[in-house]
Amino acid sequence: MTYRLPFFYLILLILLSSCETLKQSSKYQFIDGFYKTNLDGGVRTIYVLAGSDTIKAYRKSDLGTGKIDSTKAILIRFPSKKPDKFSNLSFNSKTFDVDVLTVLFKYRPPVKDFPPQFNTTFNGAAYFGYRTDVYKLSYKETPMHIFNRRIIHYGYSIGLFSGLGTARIDEYVTNNALSIQYDGLVNLSGIALILAVDKLTAGLTFGEDRLLDKNHSVWVNNAKPWIGLSIGLNIN
């Protein structure tokens, strides 16, 4: 218990301090920038100026070093109410992703005569990955038969994580090599697959724990693989 409570408060502080960053993050907002889209019947990279009612899209070939010719912009009308002619559009952007995450639970396969284990110890980690964000522009019909504008956003990412956590160390998980019980400090690391829907992010993690003290050689779970479910906050 001595290790768990302070570490829990540390993770809680990290997550709460990241909330303001999340509110200011642009990853779940459709803003000016480069995107891939299927305008003109083919996938191409364009630069988007997102206005309140109209979107201006410029081909990369039209972006020179001098003054931009605004007459070459592709105009996409996207007012609050659906215009007479509108086709649903999708825009993709790719960025590097930096998150803080915590693994809610870990499933450990059988090891050294131990049955499968389900662990829920406290932990926190930094995540670095490559992310794709998708923005779908469409209109949704209301019961009053009015079509209102909406932007559906989701993102997905794959990357690596590393951090610190706790693990219960006792005679059972050391094959009676120890006669004491304590919460050991471990380094957790591995690969994560992250899915984001607007502000909510969750991920499937594949990792291992390494005990950071002299008893690592007798801990049956040391450097053994596990599968977990994580939640996190984007900080870039």
Regions found by a protein language model. Give the residues of each.
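N-terminal leader/presequence regions that precede the main folded/catalytic core
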Residues: T2-L10, L15-L104
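Predominantly the C-terminal beta-signal and adjacent terminal strand-loop region
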Residues: K23, K27, I191, D198-N236
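Short loop/turn motifs that connect adjacent beta-strands in outer-membrane beta-barrel proteins
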Residues: K85-T95, V134-Y156, L200
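Residues that define the transmembrane beta-barrel architecture of outer-membrane proteins
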Residues: K94, F118-G124, Y154, D183-S189, ...
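Transmembrane beta-strands of outer-membrane beta-barrel proteins
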Residues: F96-V100, G124, Y154-S162, A202-L204, ...
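Transmembrane beta-strands of outer-membrane beta-barrel pores
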Residues: T102-R108, T132-V134, S162-R168, V197-K199, ...
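Outer-membrane beta-barrel translocator domains and adjoining extracellular loop/strand segments
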Residues: P110-P115, K140-E141, D170-A177, N215-W219
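Outer membrane beta-barrel transmembrane domains
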Residues: G155-N187, A192
